[in-house]
Design a protein with these regions (language model features):
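Nudix hydrolase/Nudix homology domain
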Residues: 44-45, 51, 62-63, 69-73, ...
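Aromatic (phenylalanine/tyrosine) cluster motif
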Residues: 6, 10, 24, 36-37, ...
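Acidic, metal-coordinating catalytic segment for phosphate/diphosphate chemistry
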Residues: 81-124
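Unchanged
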Residues: 150-237
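Conserved Nudix-box catalytic region and its N-terminal flanking loop in Nudix hydrolases
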Residues: 68-78, 128-165, 170
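An acidic, glycine-rich, mixed-charge low-complexity segment common to nucleic-acid enzymes
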Residues: 42-84, 88-90, 97-101
Length: 255
């Protein structure tokens, strides 16, 4: 799959809220039963949230969800609000590496989960140069992909490019499609934060000098070939590993 297929305008919320399925639904004949089946099936498939807490994962899904999950995951039912609090504590303290909390209304569960955190939106890129190398940054001893907070009033897609430019000193970025969205939590000054990060496909020239943004704790910026890329993956965050496993990203990187 060529990188050019990923370059062009893309609407973040279309993927986040599941609107990409509209193309599929539109192909079905106009009989009410067929349309109802398509919409119902798509809703069932989409009803799932995956949140990374430290090195563990909490999955929120409906009882109807048909998405596959790790067989080693612990499964619990969401009956009342205290179930969410207990699930968060269990995952956060490392008692369970993967916990699935399932209930009748996944959106209600999601709102309950979010009530325990301050939500911050961020954006970044999976950046590939003309040599098919991937851009990585080293921050606090861990390899990461360049990203940063979306400023007030700023468009997510613009923030993604700006953050990559600032953190790595690269120029001439071509922003493409949204590759995925990740959720992870952390603490800042005793406040629990939930970060929602939008990841875009990006390309740029390899003929430029990289410079880490030291004030942001970044000590190294590299273009990684396949061997170096795999080395970075072995020392990165679980949310990044999960992002790179997504089919759309795998096709984009061609590794």
């Amino acid at each position: 799959m060529r990188l050019s297929q990923y370059i062009g305008e893309f609407h973040p919320e279309a993927q986040v809220k599941g609107l990409l399925g509209c193309n599929f639904i539109a192909l079905i004949c106009n009989r009410n039963s067929a349309i109802f089946f398509a919409v119902s099936l798509f809703k069932i498939i989409q009803q799932m949230y995956r949140i990374f807490i430290n090195d563990s994962v909490l999955i929120l899904r409906s009882f109807e969800s048909i998405l596959e999950v790790d067989e080693q995951s612990e499964i619990q039912s969401y009956i009342y609000a205290s179930c969410m609090k207990k699930a968060i504590s269990k995952v956060q303290n490392g008692i369970c590496k993967s916990l699935i909390l399932q209930g009748d209304d996944v959106e209600h569960m999601w709102r309950d989960f979010c009530s325990h955190y301050q939500l911050i939106e961020a954006a970044g890129g999976v950046v590939v140069n003309s040599k098919s190398e991937v851009l990585w940054i080293l921050r606090n001893g861990k390899w990461d992909l360049p990203k940063g907070k979306v400023e007030f009033g700023e468009k997510v897609k613009d923030a993604a490019v700006r953050e990559v430019e600032e953190e790595c000193a690269v120029i001439g970025i071509n922003r493409g499609a949204l590759l995925g969205v990740t959720y992870h939590t952390y603490s800042c000054k005793s406040e629990a934060i939930l970060k929602k990060t939008y990841w875009y496909a990006m390309t740029c020239s390899s003929e430029q000098v990289l410079k880490p943004q030291l004030e942001e704790g970044i000590t190294e910026v590299v273009w990684a070939d396949k061997t170096k890329h795999l080395s970075c993956v072995s020392n990165t965050y679980t949310s990044i590993v999960e992002l790179l496993k997504q089919e759309k990203v795998v096709h984009y990187l061609c590794f």
